[in-house]
Amino acid sequence: MSRYWSDIVRQLEPYVPGEQPALAHPVKLNTNENPYPPSPRALDAIRRELGDTGEALRRYPDPVARRLRETVAAYHGIAPEQVFAGNGSDEVLAHAFQALLQHDRPLRFPDITYSFYPTYARLYRVAYETVPLAGDFSIVVDDYLDDAGCVLFPNPNAPTGRALPLADIERIVAANPSSVVVIDEAYVDFGAESAVSLIARYPNLLVVHTVSKARSLAGMRVGFAFGDAALIDALTRVKDSFNSYPLDRLAQVATQASYEDEAWFQATRKQVIASRERLVGALAALGFDVVPSAANFVFARPRSHDAATLAAQLKQREIFVRHFKLPRIDQHLRITVGSDAECDALVAALRELLAA
C-alpha cells in the first residue's frame, strides 16, 4: 500500500487469474483454454497480414474492426450495428459495467459465478446484490422475475458449468423490460443455447462472447457484445473514451478467418464435448460428485479427500486444476477439459492420490 494510492485502489480486491506455469510440459487444466490449435485459416491470415516485411504493423488498426464485425454479424444473422468488438470479453464486460449497469437499483448476479463481476462492480462503484444459486448450483429463475434492476450471469455458469435453457433466459429478459440483462456466453458453444436469437425482440438484452474458448484464440484477446444498436452505441462511447484502438491488426484478421472456417470450429468443439463426457465418467468412477456441465470444464467434488489438498498435490506433479477458496464451493475442483492424453494423466494421478 502506498500513500499515493487513491481511495478506490485501497478498496479493490483484484481478480486473481489462473496460474500460467513456466514449465516445459505442464498438464494445464486450470484456465479453460482449448487443447487444440486455432484454425489453420487464422494462422494463414496472420501470415498474410504480416507479409514479408511486417509493413502493416506500422499502421494503426481499424478502430471499429469493420470487416470483423461484418463477418461475425453475418455468422449470427444480425446487423453489424448490433456487434461490438473489444479486447477480450473481460474488457467488453468492463465497458458494460460503465455504460449500462450503473443505475439507482443494484445489479444482480449469482452468488457463485465469474469472480470478475464483483471486482468490476467495486472498481466502477456499481451497487450489486448476489442471488443464491439452488443447492444443485442451478440458477433460480424466479429470483430474477421482478424487474428490480439489471441482471448479469454466465450461461453456462462459471465455475459450475450448469446451463439455463433458452426459454428460461427469455423469461428473465422479458420480465426485466426497464433494465439491461447481460448474458455472458463465454462457454456457450460447448452445449448451451445462445440468446443471440432473442436480440431482435428484446432491446434490453446484451449477449457477450469470446474467442478464447471454442475458437482457441485466448492469446489474441478478442471478445464481442451483441445487442440492440443503442446498447452497442453505449459501449462504443465508453470504448472511445478509453481506447480507440482495442483490437490489433493480427487479432482482427485471425478472428475473422476463424469465423470463416466452420468445419474446423465444429470438429474441435465436438471433440472437446466428447472428451468432457469421457472425463465425467472417469471422475465419477473415482468417487467424485460431478455437476452436469455444458462448458469446456467440469466442476467436481471429491467425496473422500480435501479439494484444496488434492489441487496442491496435483500441482506437485505439474498438473494444474483450479480450486476456489470460497463459501459453498471450497470442496470442489474446476477442471478444464484438455486433450484425452491430458485428461488421462489427470485421472491416473488422482487414482494414485486417492488410494494413498
UniProtKB/Swiss-Prot annotation:
UniProtKB keywords: Amino-acid biosynthesis, Aminotransferase, Histidine biosynthesis, Pyridoxal phosphate, Transferase
GO molecular function (one): histidinol-phosphate transaminase activity
Protein species of origin: Burkholderia mallei (strain ATCC 23344)
Modified residues (N6-(pyridoxal phosphate)lysine): 213
Plastid among keywords: no
Phylogenetic lineage: Bacteria, Pseudomonadati, Pseudomonadota, Betaproteobacteria, Burkholderiales
The protein, known as: Histidinol-phosphate aminotransferase 2
Family per similarity comment: Belongs to the class-II pyridoxal-phosphate-dependent aminotransferase family. Histidinol-phosphate aminotransferase subfamily.
Catalytically driven reaction(s): L-histidinol phosphate + 2-oxoglutarate = 3-(imidazol-4-yl)-2-oxopropyl phosphate + L-glutamate
